[in-house]
């Protein structure tokens, strides 16, 4: 980098170099000499222009002598005119004769009488001047504004008479202190002054090298953390100055540069008024005050007046740079604050965003859009009026070329008169010339597409109906903009890359986006429906032509079921489907079209054709599909009448029943049997139930009406318009409505829209409707801001190389939450490259080898083989120095091919996440206690077959003989099937190496068999404990090293299901299965073929023919294998003991046939518990004693109506002095103490004797308040901003055993002692509930308290891979629930950008300081440099930075400054002399050159031209 800089020479600002000649951009602080070198003269007068002659005043702010002539090549007095005098300086008015363009870059200066501080370096935090001098910002401001004195040389001065408290250099004294001290010590060399001069002197005197060395020593010596922080801050500023070659005193201005006049113009308005740029007013105030100060100094005015004038000068310069930063803003004539230089560049209206990143362009126009159903996919209709304007220069050239016009003037005239030749030429110009159409808001790359224009009459642009969904356009008055690409390159790009017929797939997910919608779907749906008893039924037709003839002769109904010949066999279809078949390519299998086509089916059909036929075939097919859809929708003429909206007859009665049920609940509540919360929940449940059952009846009714030809049903069923929820409101009942705070009103709207609402119901409805509209407006803004942040953080990720050569990757598996599948494995691995081989879990052979790109077939194959997790190459583990490599990215979703070098994948990723943002909800869901009985889990049930294994599980057997779970965590129940059995009796040996586990059974003297297992295939302890990862499909070792086994015992097992404690089975649940018990289920064949039975011997299967249909299985390790015709294994099924076999050996079976089944068909329950309360159970036998359980104070007596007993219940609020508890004195004399929570109900009496596992008390779960769940957009931005949640949960940093130390200031001290002697301490707040107890074993990443887990903690405890997994699955959860498909890779790219910074822990021999936060790239470059010199490299830890901070902290100055915090970014960059290498997109857009992606990445010297031989 420094090498690179040595070869660069600075360019003058006004040089004629082109943007492509700029190699890099560096910001520095300007020295006074530099300012003078820029200047063309001093501005002495505040005047602007003469009011009579309107000529600029000499030496004023618009002076022509300084800044250059006003008219091109003409001096001010008019003595010299025309080009021939170029460069002459007029002796009369002093103006150089040259182009007036120089007024845009010639600068002037103002010679300030007193040095003035630059406000950016004073008030922009951290204050740079203050930091250097070690003075507080407030004190520094007091000195600069002449309110306090700063000491330069203290002499012998001290604050007291004894000299014990001496005055130090840089002390700030107020007026009183100064008067006192100077009267006593004034003649002993005390020098203390106020104002800019003294600050400038102090800065000039600093010896930075010396200070740097001194501070480096101090930082080693100091122990206090706070002191270290301040020293590091100072070190950073000093280091920045040393590196950049800036001098500290340059932060004080003595020469103020004056902006070129054309950049702060004076514009004359009609009516003789002038609109003047605010900057001019601010400059005028500076000049006025400076001139006045000059006079006062010359007159030797009293100190106090001069001082006041200097202060005012400082304020005037402050206002010029950043008005309103300090004190009140300076206001103009119209009472609004003037816009200072800072405001001119920052914000949406500032230079960066308004003029540099977004410019208005010529050759563009906009108009309303209308639908153009007769257009081809790559066409749009362009009004002739617009075309004639847009293509005017092209048109004029064409008219001349064809000889219709001799001069341009004549051509122009012809165009104005619109003679016939003009139209003829226009047709020729427009032919084959693409135009770009854009619809705002431009949310993703499909919002700008290219079309070939077709000239049309009228004034509206015609748009092809299939591209509407990409533009998100409709025809209710939307407008679109047209742009004409001018250069050959732009035209080529538009034709090759941007034509609408090329952009059929959505870059976010790779699914087709240009698919028919609405009317077209309705037409195609109707076309493929079947009707009974119509003309031409069951007739046989040879081909489509015959069908069409019959149809036109009205001998055949469109929906008649007919027979036809397909692939040489007779198949049934309908007339309509055969007509559709005529436009479908021949290679499409029957299953795609010979059925009723709904929206999803049409999407699948298009996807299939794209996959096989490619882009051009698909585009043609889509056009045909569109035409056919519209044609039949028109022919059919589906319409809705009131009679189509059927109301089910049972509605009345059902509503009545619900009302009765509600009355009953109210009665119970009045009798005191229910709490208010329970009553509310039950009522809501009753109405929800009623609504659902009415809706079900209604949908059934509509489906059967008219044999499925009911218009309402057709529209909703096909996916053309409307949904079940809307039909329910039309003719079912409107249902429950929400209040403004999100809670549900318990009286529902029982009417529907067909019956009409009464006034009250209508009133309740208006609220929801209005909230919907308000939400939408807010949502759009939020989603837009999120997109902008994402673009900014990801814009510099581009594909920079083909393969970075890494073997690392990220392990992915299904994303499942509870029982809901969020994203299946096949979706996650599609389009990615493998980092490790995929091994078939059954046959252990390599299914897919490393480095393979996974297509759809492979993905499905992998999922069907039962693979649970796959290691993929990922952006996060890519080792490319800049950007990312193609292999780690995978498929380019937009064209289904491997991504090419130069693809701007970062921007695509940001668009893919941001664009659907507007479809997400804005709500934070208040679950507000709607925890209904139906929702709570009360048991877990096995869904697969196998046998039970307890993992780490200890149980109590209570007095009734039931098994009770005794572990609180780090245990579980597994359902497994055998994988390897011991072939002999003996001792097990397990040896763990780096990546393998070798297991063997000792065999006296004989050769023992060893089994090698991949370490990654075996479930780790934290996975078994339910903390991390998925365990299904992993291997489980039931034995430990040194255990004895019998022959035939299983030593390696495959986990089929797992229920960890406490996340799936709570503490103190009742277990329904013993360890080792078989679990039988109905086993269905996964494939078609022949069944063969085998027994497991060691790790291979041995044929077994002692089984026939009807047998009950007694053998262990019996497998049924289904083989296909080639005798290859197609499916393997474990048959557990106790099953009844349903097929004979060697029997032929179809897919889905039953192979075996349990004797009795009942669910196998693994464990059960009470879902509403958490029990406290006795861990041993003993005697109880109550503590602080005092009736009337901490507990109340409750009379139980059912049993007639009284029980004690703790109060909700317990006085602070009391800590209610039960202690259990065991027989061994040990005391166990159980702390009791509020609302707990006691089941025992004081002094009672209890047995093991007896229930002592129960705490109701309802008392644990349900938290608001953040969902939708706020959740996404919370994840990407890496905010620390308010209600944060503590998580374990290491694996170890929990204990509690002595509390600190009312906080509990939780200690984890690790296996290798590490110890971590954490403090738990009073209002948090600890989820762990003394002596329990926890794994890193496990929650220790309730609350929300922070992503920063996941990174610290579990590392980067776990964090990736967390962010990706959390973001996917939000989008998938809204039905939005986004490929993981997009989310991963943004996440890897959030991880691009590291925090230095040890600096080694590098230039870093511990605690520095720097980009990974800088860190690696510096370490390589240090290692090359033989030094000690620095050590850093990964950091997670929110996207806003990551964007502001970008390596590029321009990109960071144009995003947010402009002044802050520019301030720190100028001091550090940061160099912007112009490597990314934004910077290059700003300086106006090609962006370095795609062909822009290839430097011009890489392309060599050579003469043809």
From Swiss-Prot:
Binds 1 Mg(2+) ion per subunit. Binds 2 Zn(2+) ions per subunit. CDD domains: RNAP_beta'_C, RNAP_beta'_N. InterPro entries: DNA-dir_RpoC_beta_prime, DNA-dir_RpoC_beta_prime_bact, RNA_pol_asu, RNA_pol_N, RNA_pol_Rpb1_1, RNA_pol_Rpb1_3, RNA_pol_Rpb1_3_sf, RNA_pol_Rpb1_4. GO terms for molecular function: DNA binding; DNA-directed RNA polymerase activity; magnesium ion binding; zinc ion binding. Its EC number is 2.7.7.6. Mg(2+) binds at residues 474, 476, 478. Zn(2+) 1 binds at residues 75, 77, 90, 93. Keywords: DNA-directed RNA polymerase, Magnesium, Metal-binding, Nucleotidyltransferase, Transcription, Transferase, Zinc. GO terms for cellular component: DNA-directed RNA polymerase complex. Its cofactor is Mg(2+); Zn(2+). It catalyses: RNA(n) + a ribonucleoside 5'-triphosphate = RNA(n+1) + diphosphate. Zn(2+) 2 binds at residues 804, 878, 885, 888. It comes from the Bacteria. One of its GO terms (biological process) is DNA-templated transcription. The RNAP catalytic core consists of 2 alpha, 1 beta, 1 beta' and 1 omega subunit. When a sigma factor is associated with the core the holoenzyme is formed, which can initiate transcription. Belongs to the RNA polymerase beta' chain family. DNA-dependent RNA polymerase catalyzes the transcription of DNA into RNA using the four ribonucleoside triphosphates as substrates. This is DNA-directed RNA polymerase subunit beta'.
């Amino acid at each position: 980098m420094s090498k690179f800089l040595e070869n660069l020479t600075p360019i003058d600002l006004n040089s004629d170099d082109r943007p492509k000649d700029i190699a890099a951009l560096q910001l520095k602080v300007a020295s006074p000499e530099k300012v003078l070198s820029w200047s063309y003269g001093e501005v002495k007068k505040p005047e602007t222009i003469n009011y009579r002659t309107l000529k600029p005043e000499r030496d004023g702010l618009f002076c022509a002598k300084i800044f250059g002539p006003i008219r091109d090549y003409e001096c001010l007095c008019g003595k010299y005119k025309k080009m021939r005098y170029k460069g002459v300086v007029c002796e009369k008015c002093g103006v150089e004769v040259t182009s007036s363009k120089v007024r845009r870059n010639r600068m002037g200066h103002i010679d300030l009488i007193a040095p003035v501080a630059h406000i950016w370096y004073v008030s922009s935090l951290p204050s740079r001047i203050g930091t250097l001098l070690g003075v507080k910002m407030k004190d520094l401001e007091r000195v600069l504004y002449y309110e306090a004195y700063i000491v330069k040389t203290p002499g012998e001065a001290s604050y007291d008479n004894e000299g014990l408290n001496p005055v130090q250099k840089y002390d700030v004294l107020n007026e009183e202190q100064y008067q006192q001290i100077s009267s006593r010590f004034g003649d002993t060399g005390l020098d203390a002054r106020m104002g800019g001069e003294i600050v400038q002197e102090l800065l000039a005197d600093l010896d930075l090298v010396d200070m740097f060395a001194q501070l480096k020593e101090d930082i080693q010596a100091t122990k206090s953390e706070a002191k270290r922080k301040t020293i590091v801050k100072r070190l950073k500023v000093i280091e920045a100055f040393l590196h950049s070659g800036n001098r500290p005193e340059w932060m004080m201005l003595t020469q103020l540069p004056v902006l070129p006049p054309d950049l702060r113009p004076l514009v004359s308005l009609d009516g003789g008024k002038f609109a003047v740029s605010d900057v001019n007013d601010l400059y005028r105030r500076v000049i006025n005050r400076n001139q006045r100060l000059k006079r006062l100094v010359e007159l030797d005015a009293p100190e106090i007046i001069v001082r006041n004038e200097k202060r005012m000068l400082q304020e005037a310069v402050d206002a010029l740079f950043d008005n309103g930063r300090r004190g009140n803003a300076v206001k103009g004539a119209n009472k609004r604050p003037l816009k200072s230089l800072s405001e001119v560049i920052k914000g949406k209206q500032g230079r960066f965003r308004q003029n540099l990143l977004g410019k208005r362009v010529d050759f563009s126009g906009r108009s309303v859009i209308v639908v153009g159903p007769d257009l081809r996919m790559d066409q749009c209709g362009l009004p002739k009026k617009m075309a004639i304007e847009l293509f005017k220069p092209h048109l004029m050239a064409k008219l001349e070329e064809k000889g219709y016009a001799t001069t341009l003037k004549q051509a122009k005239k012809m165009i104005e008169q619109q003679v016939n030749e003009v139209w003829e030429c226009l047709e020729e110009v427009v032919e084959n010339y693409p135009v770009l159409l854009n619809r705002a808001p431009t949310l993703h790359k499909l919002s700008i597409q290219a079309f070939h224009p077709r000239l049309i009459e009228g004034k509206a642009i015609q748009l092809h109906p299939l591209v509407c969904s990409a533009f998100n356009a409709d025809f209710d008055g939307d407008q679109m903009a047209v742009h004409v690409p001018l250069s050959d390159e732009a035209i080529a790009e538009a034709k090759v890359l941007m034509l609408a017929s090329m952009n059929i797939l959505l870059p976010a997910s790779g699914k087709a986006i240009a698919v028919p919608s609405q009317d077209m779907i309705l037409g195609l749906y109707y076309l493929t429906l079947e009707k009974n008893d119509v003309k031409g039924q069951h007739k046989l037709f040879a081909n489509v032509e015959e069908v069409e003839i019959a149809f036109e002769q009205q001998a055949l109904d469109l929906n008649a079921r007919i027979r036809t010949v397909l692939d040489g066999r007779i198949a049934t279809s309908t007339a309509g489907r055969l007509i559709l078949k005529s436009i479908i390519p021949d290679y499409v299998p029957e299953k795609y079209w010979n059925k009723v086509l709904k929206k999803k089916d049409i999407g699948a059909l298009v996807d299939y054709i794209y996959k096989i036929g490619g882009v051009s075939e698909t585009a043609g097919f889509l056009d045909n599909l569109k035409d056919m859809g519209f044609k039949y929708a028109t022919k059919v003429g589906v319409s809705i009448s009131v009679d189509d909206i059927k109301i089910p007859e049972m509605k009345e009665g059902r509503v009545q029943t619900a009302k009765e049920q509600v009355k009953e609940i109210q009665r119970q509540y009045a009798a005191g049997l229910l709490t208010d919360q329970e009553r509310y929940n039950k009522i809501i449940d009753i109405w929800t139930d009623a609504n659902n059952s009415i809706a079900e009846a209604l949908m059934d009714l509509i489906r059967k009406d008219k044999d499925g030809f009911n218009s309402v049903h057709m529209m909703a069923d096909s996916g053309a318009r409307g949904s079940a929820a809307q039909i329910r409101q039309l003719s079912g009942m409107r249902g429950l409505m929400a209040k403004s705070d999100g809670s549900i009103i318990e009286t529902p709207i029982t009417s529907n829209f067909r019956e009409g609402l009464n006034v009250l119901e209508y009133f309740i409805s208006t609220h929801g409707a209005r909230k919907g509209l308000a939400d939408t407006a807010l949502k759009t803004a939020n989603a837009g801001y999120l997109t902008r942040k994402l673009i900014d953080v990801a814009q510099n990720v581009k594909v920079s190389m083909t393969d970075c050569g890494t073997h690392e990757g990220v392990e992915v598996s299904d994303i499942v939450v509870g029982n809901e599948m969020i994203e299946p494995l096949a979706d996650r691995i599609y389009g990615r490259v493998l980092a490790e081989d995929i091994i078939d879990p059954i046959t252990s052979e390599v299914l897919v080898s490393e480095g393979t790109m996974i297509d759809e077939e492979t993905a499905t194959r992998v999922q069907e083989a039962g693979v649970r997790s796959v290691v993929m190459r990922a952006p996060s583990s890519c080792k490319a120095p800049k950007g990312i490599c193609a292999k780690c990215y995978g498929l380019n979703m937009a064209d289904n091919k491997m991504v090419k070098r130069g693809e701007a994948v970062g921007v695509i990723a940001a668009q893919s996440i941001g664009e659907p943002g507007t479809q997400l909800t804005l709500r934070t869901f208040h679950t507000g206690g709607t925890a209904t009985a139906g929702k709570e889990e009360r048991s877990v049930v096995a869904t697969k077959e196998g046998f039970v294994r307890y993992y780490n599980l200890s149980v109590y057997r209570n007095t009734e003989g039931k098994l009770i779970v005794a572990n609180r965590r780090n245990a579980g129940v597994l359902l497994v099937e055998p994988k390897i059995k011991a072939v002999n009796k003996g001792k097990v040996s397990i040896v763990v190496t780096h990546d393998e586990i070798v297991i063997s059974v000792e065999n006296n003297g004989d050769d023992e068999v060893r089994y090698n297992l991949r370490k990654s295939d075996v479930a780790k302890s934290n996975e078994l404990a339910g903390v991390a990862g998925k365990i299904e499909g992993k291997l489980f070792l039931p034995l430990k090293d040194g255990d004895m086994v019998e022959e035939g015992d299983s030593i390696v097992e495959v986990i089929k299901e797992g229920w960890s404690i406490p996340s799936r089975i709570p503490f103190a649940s009742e277990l329904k299965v013993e360890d080792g018990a078989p679990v039988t289920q109905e086993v269905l064949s996964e494939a078609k073929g022949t069944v063969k039975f085998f027994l497991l011997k060691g790790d291979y299967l041995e044929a077994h023919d002692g089984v026939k249909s009807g047998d009950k299985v007694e053998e262990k390790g019996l497998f049924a294998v289904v083989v296909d015709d080639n005798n290859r294994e197609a499916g393997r099924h474990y048959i557990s003991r106790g099953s009844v076999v349903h097929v004979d050996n060697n029997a032929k079976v179809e897919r889905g046939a039953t192979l075996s089944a349990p004797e009795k068909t009942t669910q196998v329950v693994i464990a059960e518990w009470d879902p509403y309360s958490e029990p406290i159970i006795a861990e041993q036998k003993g005697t109880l004693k109550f503590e602080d359980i005092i009736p009337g104070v901490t507990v109340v007596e409750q009379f139980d109506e059912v049993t007639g007993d009284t029980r004690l219940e703790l109060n909700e609020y317990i006085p602070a002095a009391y800590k209610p508890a039960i202690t259990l004195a065991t027989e061994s004399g040990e005391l166990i103490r159980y702390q009791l929570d509020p609302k707990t109900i006691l089941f025992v009496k004081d002094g009672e004797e209890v047995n093991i596992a007896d229930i002592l008390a129960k705490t109701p779960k309802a008392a644990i308040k349900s938290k608001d769940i953040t969902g939708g957009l706020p959740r996404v931005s919370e994840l990407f901003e890496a905010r620390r949640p308010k209600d944060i949960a503590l998580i374990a940093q290491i694996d170890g055993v929990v204990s509690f130390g002595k509390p600190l200031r009312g906080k509990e001290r939780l200690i984890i002692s690790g296996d290798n002697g590490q110890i971590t301490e954490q403090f738990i707040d009073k209002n948090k509930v600890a989820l762990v107890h003394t002596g329990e074993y926890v794994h890193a990443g496990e929650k220790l308290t309730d609350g929300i887990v922070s992503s920063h903690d996941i990174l610290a405890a579990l590392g980067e891979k776990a964090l990736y997994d967390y962010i990706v699955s959390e973001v996917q959860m939000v989008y998938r629930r809204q039905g939005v498909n986004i490929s993981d890779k997009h989310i991963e790219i943004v996440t890897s950008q959030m991880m691009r910074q590291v925090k230095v822990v040890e600096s080694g021999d590098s230039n870093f300081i511990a605690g520095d936060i720097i980009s990974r790239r800088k860190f690696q470059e510096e370490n390589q440099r240090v290692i090359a010199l033989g030094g000690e490299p620095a050590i850093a830890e990964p950091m997670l930075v929110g996207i806003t901070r990551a964007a502001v902290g970008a390596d590029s100055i321009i990109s960071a400054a144009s995003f947010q915090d402009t002044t802050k970014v520019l301030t720190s960059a100028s001091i550090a002399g940061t160099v912007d290498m112009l490597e990314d997109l934004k910077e290059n857009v700003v300086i106006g050159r090609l962006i370095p992606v795609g062909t822009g990445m290839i430097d011009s010297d890489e392309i060599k031209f050579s003469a043809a031989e």
